[in-house]
Amino acid sequence: MNIVILAAGTGKRMRSALPKVLHPLAGRPLLSHVIDTARTLQPSRLVVVVGHGAEQVKAAVAAPDVQFAVQAEQLGTGHAVRQALPLLDPAQPTLVLYGDVPLTRASTLQRLVDAARDGRYGILTVTLDDPTGYGRIVRDASGFVTRIVEQKDASPEELKIAEINTGIIVTPTAQLSMWLGALKNENAQGEYYLTDVVELAIEAGFEVVTSQPDDEWETLGVNSKAQLAELERIHQRNVADALLVDGVTLADPARVDVRGTLRCGRDVSIDVNCVFEGNVTIADNVTIGANCVIRNASVGAGTRIDAFTHIDGAELGANTVIGPYARLRPGAQLADEAHVGNFVEVKNAVIGHGSKANHLTYIGDADIGARVNIGAGTITCNYDGANKFRTVIEDDVFVGSDTQLVAPVRVGRGVTIAAGTTIWKDVAEGVLALNEKTQTAKSGYVRPVKKKS
């Protein structure tokens, strides 16, 4: 089977410099969703017709299995499909999809393909309570499809028809070239409509069949930011429903967003306003507090992530405790039972088994062993303005509050670092490290008093 995806439109109503098919739905371009669905049908040829912003669209979705045809002028859907003909296998049927219709299920498309076997012409239709704006399916007294009429060209009687054309079709490819060549642009838009091919197929004696999706929203397209927002919410609700079916507890299914792939184990609980981006894996018995953002991360079993935590590109072991208000940046690796508390940032660092950094700390480019305590206000000074350096803290080290570790530096096993110490040299195992200071008390000191006006 050939699949052609039309993605050449300008999208004027989006009021954006970004090509319409590249606007994100759940964090990925609309067109990417359509291509992914198309791939599940295992086409022999997959062709995307580009036009407006062609190079930008190509760059966004380029892949070995995707070919591109260019529609230099936007002269209608029939003209767009014509540009793809040289890339198609004429011996295989062609399924036509749209780059701005991202939610159609693969099963819906497969039913249409099955209905159109043996050289039939298939149309995906929907019956709507309000069909305003859509092309109508015109049938004869026996119920056979005779033509499709666009809203702007429909008569008053035809406007009463509730069954509409979604634009998604399956057609014999060998005849499609001839039919497209016979199209005329004698309509209100002055365009070559793909919908007019159905009349030519009927005239040629081809049987026209129809199929409908399980849900109306499967064929909704995007022509404005309002419609994009509507589809986003539909998609997110579908994702939430799937999570609930899998046993995930969602405090409010309407207030969780998944912008990528989220895989959850058993007994996972997610509070409100959480966002998951990229590829996220969550093991069993994980609790996630409100307003967390988790991106491209893996979370070990039994972990608790408290509210307002941001995790990006991190790996969390089992039974870790994170947050609230913690930030784990790319390269953060936490071993089992590690704790990272409020206003702690970890970047490109390993924190060992049972180690804790509970308050107001920056750990960057560091290797921290097991059972290490990092006091509040500790900073690994990893950057000299040009280069990054690593800090190594071995097992069982106690780091007092307000400590600065100036990398590159190594702190040996079992060291105790006194509060307020700056470490700029390696520290041997088992010692107390401190910067000796003198505390002075001056008698007779008078605190300044603010003058009253």
UniProtKB/Swiss-Prot annotation:
It is an enzyme of class 2 (transferase). The active site is at H359 (proton acceptor). Residues 247-453 are annotated as: N-acetyltransferase. Its EC number is 2.7.7.23, 2.3.1.157. One of its GO terms (cellular component) is cytoplasm. Residues 226-246 are annotated as: Linker. It is found in: Cytoplasm. InterPro entries: Bifunctional_GlmU, GlmU-like, GlmU_C_LbH, Hexapep, Hexapep_transf_CS, MobA-like_NTP_Trfase, Nucleotide-diphossugar_trans, Trimer_LpxA-like_sf. The keyword Transmembrane does not apply. Binds 1 Mg(2+) ion per subunit. Pathway: Nucleotide-sugar biosynthesis; UDP-N-acetyl-alpha-D-glucosamine biosynthesis; N-acetyl-alpha-D-glucosamine 1-phosphate from alpha-D-glucosamine 6-phosphate (route II): step 2/2; Nucleotide-sugar biosynthesis; UDP-N-acetyl-alpha-D-glucosamine biosynthesis; UDP-N-acetyl-alpha-D-glucosamine from N-acetyl-alpha-D-glucosamine 1-phosphate: step 1/1; Bacterial outer membrane biogenesis; LPS lipid A biosynthesis. Acetyl-CoA binds at A376, N382, Y383, S401, A419. Its cofactor is Mg(2+). Residues 1-225 are annotated as: Pyrophosphorylase. In the N-terminal section; belongs to the N-acetylglucosamine-1-phosphate uridyltransferase family. In the C-terminal section; belongs to the transferase hexapeptide repeat family. NCBIfam families: glmU (TIGR01173). Catalyzes the last two sequential reactions in the de novo biosynthetic pathway for UDP-N-acetylglucosamine (UDP-GlcNAc). The C-terminal domain catalyzes the transfer of acetyl group from acetyl coenzyme A to glucosamine-1-phosphate (GlcN-1-P) to produce N-acetylglucosamine-1-phosphate (GlcNAc-1-P), which is converted into UDP-GlcNAc by the transfer of uridine 5-monophosphate (from uridine 5-triphosphate), a reaction catalyzed by the N-terminal domain. This is Bifunctional protein GlmU. It comes from Burkholderia cenocepacia (strain HI2424). The lineage of its organism: Bacteria, Pseudomonadati, Pseudomonadota, Betaproteobacteria, Burkholderiales.
